[in-house]
Amino acid sequence: MSFHDRAETLLVRAILGGFGALSPVAASNLGGRIMRAIGPLMPSNRVAIDNLRHALPELSAAEHRRIARQAWENLGRVLAELVHLPGILQQTASGPGLELVCSDLITAALQAQPPAIFFSAHLANWEILIPQGIRMGGRMGGIYRAPQRSGVDGLLTRLRHIAAGRAFPLFPKGGKGGRDAFAHLRGGGKLAVLMDQKLNEGISVPFFDRPAMTAPASAKFALHFRCPLVPVHIERLGPARYRMIAEPYVEPPASGDTERDVMIVTARINQIIEGWVRARPGEWLWMHRRWPSE
């Protein structure tokens, strides 16, 4: 591990330790306030405003700035809540906790013999999906974008394992990760994928009426294994409080034209995610370069 890797890991550990010393609500509020203040000053805020301008042109510039501030605040809350995930995953009537909607759809997919693919997006607190699926009895793994610093990657992975109550496989995006995810599904495992990030090697399908390079692996896996794609998204109800919602499965077509079927399934996934984002735009990660630069 390099000096910079060790230094950054120690810094992240110290920050998370500070949040861990607070209550879940206090940590969430503090993280949100910090990022709401500094996020709009960061270069990636220009990406967020540009994305909003193209995706939601019917809104005013002031509304775009407001949504961008909300997105920064949500990101700060997500980071601060990482150390409090075990408590957040408790099903409570109020305060920190999680509400489940249509959980029978999740349970059925987790308990079914064939593999299943759960897709979601960077909405509200996306770190909830896999740990909650494991707590519900699923043998889940996930595809993720690994941080550049291996020490930070290991630290975040340990926090995710603590939230789930046990270790689970995470497959870095890329060729080897894709092959390992395929093997996990072939062995009867379940896979969670966040489908809203740009993949330069992906396929171009519409997202907010603009071509967006999108990973086709989930569609290809579903077609290969003839397994359902389960839409699941998270909504923020307050500091450290969430609702996880499952929707009817996306069943893979069987036209015999694999390339066409992959396009159809991937476009449907983007359409579903777009609906989630339009409903709660302040909870999405607008500062990501989702579309090609113009």
Residue ranges of each PLM-predicted region?
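Membrane-anchoring hydrophobic helices of lipid-metabolizing enzymes
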Residues: 1-120, 157-159
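Short Gly/charged-rich anion-binding patches and loops
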Residues: 14, 47, 104, 128, ...
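Alpha-helix N-cap/helix-start capping motif
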Residues: 46, 103-104, 123, 146, ...
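Short, flexible loop segments at the rims of nucleotide/cofactor-binding pockets, characterized by
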Residues: 92-98, 166-173, 207-209, 255
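Conserved beta-strand termini and adjacent loop/short-helix elements that scaffold enzyme active sites
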Residues: 101-103, 143-145, 171-175, 247-249, ...
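Catalytic core of membrane glycerolipid acyltransferases/transacylases, capturing the structured
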Residues: 112-174, 200-205, 236
